[in-house]
Amino acid sequence: MTSPWPEPEIGRWLTLAPREPGQPPLACWLALPPQAPPRAGILVLPEIFGVNAWLRSVATRLALAGYAALAVPLFSRTAPGLELGYDDAAVREGRFHKERTSAADLLADLALAADGLAQALPDLPAGVGCVGFCFGGHVAMLAASLPQVRASCDFYGAGVATGRPGGGPPTLEGLAASPGRLLCVCGSEDALIPPEDVAAIAAALQAANRDR
């Protein structure tokens, strides 16, 4: 069946070698502008469905807009190479792997991805952006704490006000100490982000002088 998200020939798989004990290789998808040097690098973080055709299409669109876009897997420790669809079984499988992540492991992988992108493209401006969706949006908020990440965009990142991957204080509580810029986009009818969570996110962003 033809994919609803066709991929122009501007992307390729890029595997980053681990640099910490227990860290797996990261099989990322790199999309580059076809006609000019990239203006900046962006990490693209998936929902619970892995680096699938849709996420690769997001990287492609960013590349066509002039960016070096690196789609980064979030479940490399439990499901390397995961690509899921969107049926109920896929949701169950994706949630299974999500519950086995930790903030420390995710941040280590994102730091590796940011540094790997800089090494692959040494002429890029210093620092990267980060964009993530749903669970990837939650992780994009975490990524704002990394020195390599200049700006993050969290699209409907659920659970930031009440939890943190692997346990610990809610991710939102660390926002004030994060050096990177952050934009959060929440849907008014998103059942996974109730109004009280949206209010908490808005208050934290305002207190930290961030966007919302």
Task: Name each model-derived stretch.
Residues 1-212:
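N-terminal cap/leader regions of alpha/beta-hydrolase-fold enzymes
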